Amino acid sequence: MRNLLLACLAFPFSLFGQDNAKPLSIKGSFKNVQPEPEWVYLYHRVNGTSVKDSCKVIDNAYTFTLKMVEPELLAFRVKYANAGSAKQFTPLAGGSTSNQSRDAFNVYAGDGRIRINSTDSFSNVSIKGSKHHEAYLALQALRKPYDDKMKVLYQDYAKANAKKDTEARDRVEAQIDVLESDLKENVLSGYIQKNPSSPAAFYALQQYAGWDINPDKVEPLFNALPAAVQEYPTVKSFKEQLETAKLTGIGRMAPEFTQNDTLEQPVQLSSFKGRYLLIDFWASWCGPCRQENPNVVKVFNQYKDKNFHILGISLDRAGQKDKWMKAIHDDNLTWSHLSDLKYWDNAVSKQYGIRAIPQNLLLDPTGKIIAKNLRGEALAKKMEELLEGK
């Protein structure tokens, strides 16, 4: 359920220079595309920051020249003559192309020369010159049956959520979880194992790992990547995330930390030993977090007198303590709360490798991590298993 519920995302990329950059030349053209394209926008990353480049269309053609330090999923969008400004566009979450707009498309590219021809519509493209994109399309073809089913389930989830039909929503969520697991194991993992040297292998690994890396499954796949690929800046950053995940996986002792509470008093994680503890990463600005809070409140109220406590870690922003406090009050979160108000630079979230929220970890009374990312009925069932009759 990652793409639905992990809607609050961080994009931590290592900063890097362009000393090893190689040129990428992109030439595009149009045939029978109406309305008439006026501008083409290209979204990519430079030194870890999202950048939008633009090119005015002249004689049904456009050109971009980039410096590439590693392969990247590029996003293209169009502004038509006499039309409003193009909206912000980035590559689709999860890598799916099933929801692509007529006015947008993605290209997975490295260095070299690429030719893009659009016929009848902007996104009806033929792309030549990129072995990376050919590998990407082959992977997308394997994904497509799953993505098509996922699209329908997402629509069902949205309908149930709009009707506040929690039973139907939870049922669809369970179906999505199963389908995502099947996609990862049957398509992504298999693709990497069979094609570790493919230009799209690391892209597939990113999709497989998701926002909550399982090091036992991910590390063998990572180690199969060619040594040259492991030197790419983003791959090195991924390796760091993998190492962090190894320290915070199920069965490991939760790393110690200290952070201030709402009264600016330092609180240590170890002070909660002796109780089952749910470490809950959230923020007042995170819609999915706020949506999940009633479920967490229900479980807390049921088990708070049975050796169970919750420790909230907020990723709220500097200067917005009032919003953090208001969310605590409005959502009736009557447990312990910590934050350094540093947004995605929250020290605890970085220590634990948190790159999307909501996320949580369940600790046993010794401080060992025994479960992760329990939501809704899953959290209630786990606590019933651990504490009923005690």
Q: Positions of the model-derived regions?
A:
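Thiol/disulfide oxidoreductase modules built on the thioredoxin-like
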Residues: 333, 340-388
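Bacterial Sec-dependent N-terminal signal peptides
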Residues: 1-28, 389-390
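A non-transmembrane, solvent-exposed segment enriched in polar/low-complexity residues
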Residues: 18-178
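Conserved redox-active cysteine motifs that mediate thiol-disulfide chemistry
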Residues: 273-277, 281-298
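N-terminal targeting signals for export/organelle localization
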Residues: 75-77, 84-104, 114-117, 181-253
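N-terminal "domain-start" segment that seeds a small globular fold
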Residues: 237-270, 335, 382-389
